[in-house]
Amino acid sequence: MMKKKVKIFDIVLIVIFTVFSLVMIIPVYKVLVDSFDLKTAYGMKLFPEQFGFAGYKSIFTNPTMLRPFLISCYTTAMGTIMGLLISVLGAYVLIQWKMPGRAFIANVLLFTMIFNGGMIPTYLVMKDFHLTNNLWGVILLPAINVYNLVLMKNFFEGIPVSLMESAEIDGCSHFKILYKIVLPLSKAALASIGLMYAVGYWNDYTNYKLYITNSNLYNFQMKLRALIMGSDLPSAVEGATENTVKNAAVIVAILPFMIIYPFCQKYFVQGVNIGAVKE
């Protein structure tokens, strides 16, 4: 009787998750099909009526779309590296239990998660530091993320202190302990937090809207919105319709992480146990 109940429960779960999966996959599949369809036709189709790559050629051969794409790639790469660097160094400092004032620093950081400066004061500070209309402004601001720093700290705290103390007795510097011991044991945290940074930078729209007024510095999300709204359509390659170009742009916007995610998935499973003992 118990086995029968378990089987029924499993079947119900499978049905529910299958429905959820279809709800998420079907819209993406529709956009993908329409991005290759050179014939202007609306509605759901299993395959393109007139297959072609003209929509993607319109994106990558037009400077008004290619430049924002490259800017997004640059800011995502630089921002992710800087964000991870800040999180790793900050987390490593906060796990040094002998350091005086460690608890005070941690509490100050946590305080900023609850009470921030607000939009207007932040804008004024950015302006005073000449970081408006500057790509470094939209790179540096999200890089300082206390939430990610705390996650990294929790993971580091799961590494046995005895390992680091043994390395210190053997004459290792803090940099060597971090590089040789802590980071190799933290691949799951680095992958998980790194992807969170990367997704945030790639999808960043708000910071560009607030701090960037020079259209030459817009990222792909800013151009994508203008394209979808129909206010900034690029000159289409012969054979590409307006609908084809719009759908191709959407696919370009989501494709990088659809490719990256399967390779990082195993680290997310490990990342569920952030803070677990690794001894």
PLM-predicted stretches and their roles:
Residues 2-279:
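A hydrophobic, multi-pass inner-membrane permease signature
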